[in-house]
């Protein structure tokens, strides 16, 4: 349980730090976060979702057969965590895309932040 708590807190801290940077840019004069902030936020989300999936697996395995019964709250959390971690926004292949950017490759528009293709003005901004 101690390992699970430490991994959870570390992943949560990374996500909160990255999302705080996004919020800071958006509450400033930016319509979109910068490329670096976008990339950091995506990396934090991928890491957070996959860490949570591993944590739920750990707890599910610790619970034994009790955890796999349909009435068990762990069973539902296992499905939810696996569903979230395999979603396109958090899937493991994104580590490869983000790693390539960290090694100096040009980011695709998905990771370019405000430097990417224009998406139009945000509501409430002109």
Residue ranges and their predicted role:
Residues 13-16, 20, 53, 57-61, ...:
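Charged/polar positions within long, soluble alpha-helices
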Residues 24, 28, 61-65, 87:
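General structural signal for alpha-helix termini and helix-helix connectors
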């Amino acid at each position: 349980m101690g390992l699970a708590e430490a991994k959870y807190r570390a992943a949560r801290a990374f996500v909160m730090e990255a999302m705080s940077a996004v919020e800071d840019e958006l509450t400033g004069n930016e319509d979109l976060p910068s490329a670096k902030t976008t990339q950091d936020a995506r990396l934090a989300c991928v890491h957070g979702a996959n860490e949570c999936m591993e944590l739920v697996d750990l707890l599910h395995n610790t619970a034994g057969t009790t955890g796999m019964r349909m009435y068990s709250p762990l069973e539902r959390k296992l499905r939810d965590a696996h569903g979230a971690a395999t979603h396109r926004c958090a899937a493991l292949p994104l580590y490869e895309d983000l790693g390539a950017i960290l090694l100096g490759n040009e980011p695709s528009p998905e990771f370019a932040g405000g430097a990417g293709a224009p998406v139009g003005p945000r509501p409430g901004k002109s």
